[in-house]
A protein has these predicted regions:
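Residue-level signal for inorganic ion chemistry
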Residues: 14, 18, 39, 50, ...
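Solvent-exposed beta-strand sheet faces enriched in polar/charged residues
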Residues: 60-62, 100, 230
């Protein structure tokens, strides 16, 4: 398998494994225990499979100890075996698996050369190759936000969008779980923007940002600067993904 094939394979198979854990153990475990079991099963599978197929590559995983040797490595897999754990624990559909390969010498956007996201409960798998154009939508701007931590600036952002695009009326907020699940909704034409100003980590946004860019969307921080990956501090304060003209309208306001 080439790297992109491997990324999609890892996303799909990890998704299958964690979905099976949820199906098998939902009745016997508490929500917290089920989330931990899914996280662990997904992480262990990724560690084992990457060791088999790419033994020289480094791994940055939400569930693993951070080996800072990755900072001098040429290839680093940035993965989240289970993004949206609380939704997974309650058997909700909006959890996902994120897989991204960062390469030091690459000229690719974000230096990410391969990426895959699966949403197991919806049987969705997306990669770097666009399936077709994203459907146009002339109605209210649909903004995906965290189901638990919506941006504190969201009222100001909505007002600016309403002023900039009056013909589209009042923006509509759509709470949802995993970043990967949110991205699939934008790619399907069911939403226009994703905004996070509450902060998260590289494994939350690396795969979604790379796939978004490959599909012609803009992914950046809230001020319009590029996202940077494989950093010593893996915290990412803000991010926005969406149609370029909508993202520009927001980043211009935030500068």
């Amino acid at each position: 398998m080439n790297d992109q094939e491997l990324a999609e394979y890892l996303a799909k198979e990890t998704g299958r494994i964690i979905a099976q854990v949820a199906a098998d153990r939902f009745e016997e475990l508490s929500a917290d225990e089920l989330g931990a079991a899914g996280d662990l099963a997904g992480h262990e599978y990724l560690v084992h499979t990457l060791a088999k197929h790419r033994p020289l590559d480094h791994l940055l995983s939400e569930e693993g100890e951070d080996n800072l040797g990755r900072l001098s490595a040429n290839r680093v897999w940035i993965v989240d075996p289970l993004d949206g754990t609380s939704h997974y624990s309650n058997l909700e559909a909006d959890y996902a698996v994120h897989i991204a390969l960062w390469e030091r010498d690459s000229a690719a956007k974000f230096k990410i050369t391969a990426s895959g996201i699966s949403v197991p409960a919806l049987d969705l798998l997306v990669g770097m190759k666009p399936a077709g154009p994203i459907a146009d939508w002339a109605g209210p701007i649909r903004i995906l936000v965290s189901a638990t931590r919506p941006p504190i600036e969201i009222d100001v952002i909505c007002e600016k969008l309403k002023t900039k695009f009056p013909e589209r009326g009042e923006p509509k907020l759509i709470p949802m779980g995993s970043v990967g699940a949110k991205l699939t909704q934008i790619l399907a034409g069911n939403a226009d923007l994703y905004i996070n100003t509450g902060g998260f980590y590289e494994w939350d946004i690396a795969a979604p940002a790379a796939i978004a860019a490959a599909h012609g969307l803009t992914a950046c921080d809230i001020e319009g600067a590029d996202l940077v990956f494989n950093q010593e501090n893996v915290y990412v304060p803000t991010a926005i993904i969406g149609q370029p003209h909508l993202v520009s309208a927001i980043t211009e306001v935030q500068r």
